């Protein structure tokens, strides 16, 4: 999915060559002229560079030196380290004849029967076959392709090679659900890196096939690994893998070079999946990424872990849900599979924990070609992802509703109306809700841009007037972005608006105005009544219509989520059907073992007019 099929064979050849090279480098030098590696990490924003290499005596050296330091000082230090390393090796071997030192030092024969005294090796750095002057600064001396010579041993200098800075497998793995490793690279690119998956051999199974790298030898006498046929970043275990652990062998790359390979084993075995999920049938409509003229859009409140794990949630809100199905490790598997299966171009998520964004959503969706941005609210926040092959992020214009209302001149008139109602004003300014606004530009046609807004309005059933004011702030801000900053760009406004179609908020969005005598201005009683009329200039439509419900819990069900679109520029190509009522209620309500949230994702294909 992430590489062209025609390139698969070529990548396999490259991967094999890289592994052979790694195995050759891991051993001692066996041929004259063969070179070890000296890895240099030198970043302009940091005062020091690091130098890493292995001496032939087995010791590994990691040096931190000032970038502004003369090269000669480093070479002198390397010579001292090489001499010390050889002295330790010599002490372990009582008899040693006078001969060139394998670690770079030379044996200096003393008179009579006295043991040999070892001299510091000559240490030089060469670039393009010429010695680098010792007064050259480190930052300029250590170039990629240079050769470090310690005595008779030569090291090829690799400056800033691709390297993994973070590599993790999920803590909970289920058959039928994609395993998306969390990885971070320095000087590299996941798309240019190589991946190979292994699974634990079942007891009594045949030994691993010949040719498996020695670095992948069993971690214990009772463990052995067999190679799968998966050479991609993501691996989806089958039922045959249940009860087995997984291993990932990966090599970082940048399109031209490969860095040091790493491997990691899962801390858990593959567990059985839940069977059919509520989104499986929906995926039949979203098997492929849409063509360029379409924008598949998803809006989904994924239920923050900070709310799912409370005693109130377990005993009052979701008492019908199996406790393990509320655990984040379990739900993340379902969320990842559901979202990746939609093959969306734009995904707007609500109730996203910060750690879930960085540790779960980013690794999973990035592996499927999407990139994301995050906006924290208080305990959780909003996330917007976009398909990198279709869009690039042009700019972000996120706001906090209460901060914008208090300080942005754009909302001066609205604030002047609100201050006439002190009780209502106090409640509005206490709310932490935010608006995430991202301007995306088509990668195929730079003249096509789109404003994607994402929000989660105040939740309380009696907070209708608060949601009205929040929506007024949101629409004014979106108008500023889509008219003043980027004149004429269309708008997609997604979110959990906590408002059914019968509420004032929905009436305001669809009709463009709300009268001052609407009942929602007194949604929390006469004390907080704040009569005012509001208008906006957009012509908006709910792309997915008005479903019977998008939220279904034991004590409530109703339509709270919407994808509002700009009718002047966009039209609906298709709406992906929601799960059937039978699917939703199979386990009484949501969330459940087959559905990770108390909300249902909205999915539709939009088309430019």
UniProtKB/Swiss-Prot annotation:
Residues 100-111, 213-224 have a biased composition (Low complexity). Ubiquitous. It catalyses: Exonucleolytic cleavage of poly(A) to 5'-AMP. Belongs to the CCR4/nocturin family. Residues 89-99 have a biased composition (Basic residues). It comes from the Eukaryota. Mg(2+) 1 binds at residue 351. This is 2',5'-phosphodiesterase 12. Its EC number is 3.1.4.-, 3.1.13.4. Optimum pH is 8.0 for 2'-5' oligoadenylate exonuclease activity. Keywords: Exonuclease, Hydrolase, Magnesium, Metal-binding, Mitochondrion, mRNA processing, Nuclease, Phosphoprotein, Transit peptide. One of its GO terms (biological process) is cellular response to interferon-alpha. Mg(2+) 2 binds at residues 496, 498. Its main location: mitochondrion. Residues 1-42 form a transit peptide. Enzyme that cleaves 2',5'-phosphodiester bond linking adenosines of the 5'-triphosphorylated oligoadenylates, triphosphorylated oligoadenylates referred as 2-5A modulates the 2-5A system. Degrades triphosphorylated 2-5A to produce AMP and ATP. Also cleaves 3',5'-phosphodiester bond of oligoadenylates. Plays a role as a negative regulator of the 2-5A system that is one of the major pathways for antiviral and antitumor functions induced by interferons (IFNs). InterPro entries: CCR4/nocturin_mRNA_transcr (IPR050410), Endo/exonu/phosph_ase_sf (IPR036691), Endo/exonuclease/phosphatase (IPR005135), PDE12-like_N (IPR048821). One of its GO terms (cellular component) is mitochondrial matrix. The gene is PDE12. The keyword Mitochondrion applies. It is found in: Mitochondrion matrix. Residues 89-111, 206-230 are annotated as: Disordered. The modification Phosphoserine is found at residue 217. The active site is at residue 496. PANTHER family: 2',5'-PHOSPHODIESTERASE 12, CARBON CATABOLITE REPRESSOR PROTEIN 4.
């Amino acid at each position: 999915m992430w590489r062209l099929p025609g390139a698969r064979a070529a990548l396999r050849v490259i991967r094999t060559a890289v592994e052979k090279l790694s195995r050759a480098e891991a051993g001692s030098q066996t041929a004259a002229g063969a070179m070890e590696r000296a890895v240099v990490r030198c970043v302009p924003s940091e005062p020091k560079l690091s130098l890493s290499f292995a001496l032939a005596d087995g010791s590994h050296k990691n040096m931190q030196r000032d970038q502004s330091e003369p090269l000669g000082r480093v070479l002198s230090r390397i010579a001292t380290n090489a001499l010390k390393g050889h002295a330790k090796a010599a002490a372990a071997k009582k008899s040693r004849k006078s001969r060139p030192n394998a670690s770079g030092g030379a044996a200096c024969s003393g008179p009579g029967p006295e043991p040999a005294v070892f001299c510091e090796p000559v240490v030089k750095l060469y670039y393009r076959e010429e010695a680098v002057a010792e007064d050259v600064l480190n930052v300029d001396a250590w170039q990629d392709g240079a050769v470090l010579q310690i005595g008779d041993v030569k090291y090829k200098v690799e400056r800033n090679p691709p390297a993994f800075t973070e590599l993790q497998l999920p803590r909970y793995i289920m058959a039928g659900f994609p395993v998306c490793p969390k990885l971070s690279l320095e000087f590299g690119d996941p798309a240019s890196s190589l991946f190979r998956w292994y699974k634990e051999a079942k007891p009594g199974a045949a030994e691993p096939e010949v040719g498996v790298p020695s670095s992948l030898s069993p971690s214990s006498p009772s463990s052995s690994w067999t190679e799968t046929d998966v050479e991609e970043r993501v691996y989806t275990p089958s039922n045959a893998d249940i009860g087995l652990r997984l291993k990932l062998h990966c090599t970082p790359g940048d399109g031209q070079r490969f860095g040091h390979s790493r491997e990691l084993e899962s801390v858990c075995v593959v567990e059985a999946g839940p069977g059919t999920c509520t989104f499986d049938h929906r995926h039949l409509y979203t098997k492929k990424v849409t063509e360029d003229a379409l924008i598949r859009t998803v809006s989904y409140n994924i239920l923050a872990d900070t709310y799912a794990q409370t005693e109130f949630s377990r005993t009052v809100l979701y008492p019908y849900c199996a406790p393990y199905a509320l655990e984040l490790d379990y739900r993340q598997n379902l969320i990842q599979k559901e979202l990746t299966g939609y093959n969306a171009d734009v995904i707007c998520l609500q109730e996203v924990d910060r750690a879930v964004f960085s540790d779960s959503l980013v690794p999973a969706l990035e592996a499927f070609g999407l990139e994301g941005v995050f906006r924290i609210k208080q305990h959780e926040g909003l996330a917007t992802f976009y398909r990198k092959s279709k869009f690039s992020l042009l700019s972000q214009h996120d706001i906090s509703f209460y901060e914008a209302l208090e300080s942005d001149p754009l909302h001066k008139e609205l604030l002047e109306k609100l201050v006439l109602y002190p009780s209502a004003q106090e409640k509005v300014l206490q709310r932490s809700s935010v608006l995430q606004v991202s301007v995306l530009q088509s990668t195929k046609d730079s003249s096509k841009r789109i404003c994607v807004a994402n929000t989660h309005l105040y939740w309380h059933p009696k907070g209708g007037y608060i949601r009205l004011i929040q929506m007024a702030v949101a629409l004014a801000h979106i108008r500023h972005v889509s008219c003043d900053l980027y004149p004429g760009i269309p708008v997609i406004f997604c979110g959990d608006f906590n408002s059914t179609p019968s509420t004032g908020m929905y009436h305001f969005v669809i009709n463009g105005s709300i009268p001052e005598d609407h009942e929602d201005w007194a949604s929390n009683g006469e004390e907080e009544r704040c009569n005012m009329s509001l208008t906006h200039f957009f012509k908006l439509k709910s792309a997915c219509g008005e479903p019977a419900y998008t939220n279904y819990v034991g004590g409530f069900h109703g339509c709270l989520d919407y994808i509002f679109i700009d009718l002047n520029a966009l039209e609906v190509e298709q709406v992906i059907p929601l799960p059937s009522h039978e699917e939703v209620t199979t386990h009484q309500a949501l969330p459940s073992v087959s559905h990770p949230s108390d909300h249902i994702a909205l999915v539709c294909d939009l088309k430019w007019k």
